[in-house]
């Protein structure tokens, strides 16, 4: 089966299934499960590195993990997050950093922010780099927005989210992530733009959904309220390692079939 490209993500062809992955084995597993898109998210800072937010994630982190995901040769589209301060300093810095992620194996990049970064999106798209937008709750702005809170409760916020979506569309983004906005606002945005919207914590009215893998499989310590756990991998790990430890301490492992004289 051929690999997906951004041209496969068109309005009306969904719902599209997206999930995060950060390394070779998880990328291989989620791709075999049949997802449409894989996001190498800067959320790796929180779910892999134990950071309190995504601000400490570097370009080096993103390049390394994008390379690992790309080695799985997924059929799904691979999008890599542009981390904090990798594009805010201007179009040329953004272009250089986005190019690093494309060379690492990403098919596109994602950046947070709306109309204020439309010129960045336009510069990347003109250079041949597909861009996914990200509006609503933008975790890289956590220090200025007062935490991980729903966006779009006031009329001013709703108007801003809608304007941001249209600005990103006009700048050439191929898709937009809507994070933690009211479902009614997500529906309004989805109806207002002719590119796919991908919801996370924003209800059922988008063109697709995305979740963090570790929330889905039960490896997150504090998953958000909008996530659903489909497995308890943490419990499976504890059980397996406990059995291993018990067998080592009882002299049952390694057994004869596990070594050579």
Swiss-Prot record:
Pathway: Cofactor biosynthesis; coenzyme A biosynthesis
Keywords: Coenzyme A biosynthesis, Cytoplasm, Magnesium, Metal-binding, Transferase
EC nos: 2.1.2.11
Cofactor binding mode and count: Binds 1 Mg(2+) ion per subunit.
UniProt superkingdom: Archaea
Gene Ontology BP terms: coenzyme A biosynthetic process; pantothenate biosynthetic process
Compartment(s) of residence: Cytoplasm
CDD domains the record matches: KPHMT-like
Residue sites binding 3-methyl-2-oxobutanoate per the record: 42-43, 81, 110
Binding site residues for Mg(2+): 42, 81, 112
InterPro entries: Pantoate_hydroxy_MeTrfase, Pyrv/PenolPyrv_kinase-like_dom, Pyrv_kinase-like_dom_sf
GO molecular function, one term: 3-methyl-2-oxobutanoate hydroxymethyltransferase activity
Family per record: Belongs to the PanB family.
Described purpose of this protein according to its UniProt entry: Catalyzes the reversible reaction in which hydroxymethyl group from 5,10-methylenetetrahydrofolate is transferred onto alpha-ketoisovalerate to form ketopantoate.
HAMAP family membership: PanB
PANTHER family: 3-METHYL-2-OXOBUTANOATE HYDROXYMETHYLTRANSFERASE
Quaternary structure and interacting proteins, as annotated: Homodecamer; pentamer of dimers.
UniProt protein name: 3-methyl-2-oxobutanoate hydroxymethyltransferase
């Amino acid at each position: 089966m051929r690999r997906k490209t951004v041209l496969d993500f068109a309005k009306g062809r969904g719902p599209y299934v997206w999930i995060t992955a950060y390394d070779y084995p998880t990328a291989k597993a989620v791709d075999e499960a049949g997802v449409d898109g894989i996001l190498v998210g800067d959320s790796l800072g929180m779910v892999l590195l134990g950071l309190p937010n995504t601000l400490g994630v570097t370009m080096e982190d993103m390049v390394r993990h994008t390379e690992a995901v790309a080695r799985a040769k997924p059929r799904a589209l691979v999008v890599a997050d542009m981390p904090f301060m990798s594009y805010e300093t201007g179009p040329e810095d953004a272009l250089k950093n986005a190019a690093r992620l494309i060379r690492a194996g990403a098919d596109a990049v994602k950046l947070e922010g709306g109309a204020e970064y439309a010129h960045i999106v336009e510069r990347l798209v003109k250079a041949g780099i597909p861009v996914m937008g990200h509006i609503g709750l933008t975790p890289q702005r956590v220090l200025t927005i007062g935490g991980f809170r729903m966006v779009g409760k006031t009329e001013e916020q709703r108007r801003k989210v809608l304007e941001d979506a249209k600005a990103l569309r006009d700048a050439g983004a191929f898709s937009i992530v809507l994070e933690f906005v009211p479902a009614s606002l997500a529906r309004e945005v989805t109806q207002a733009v002719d590119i796919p919207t991908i919801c996370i914590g924003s209800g059922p009215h988008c063109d697709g959904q995305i979740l963090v893998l570790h929330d889905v499989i039960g490896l997150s310590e504090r998953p958000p309220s909008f996530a659903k756990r489909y497995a308890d991998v943490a419990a499976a790990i504890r059980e397996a390692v406990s059995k291993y430890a018990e067998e080592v301490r009882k002299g049952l492992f390694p057994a004869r079939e596990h070594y050579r004289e």
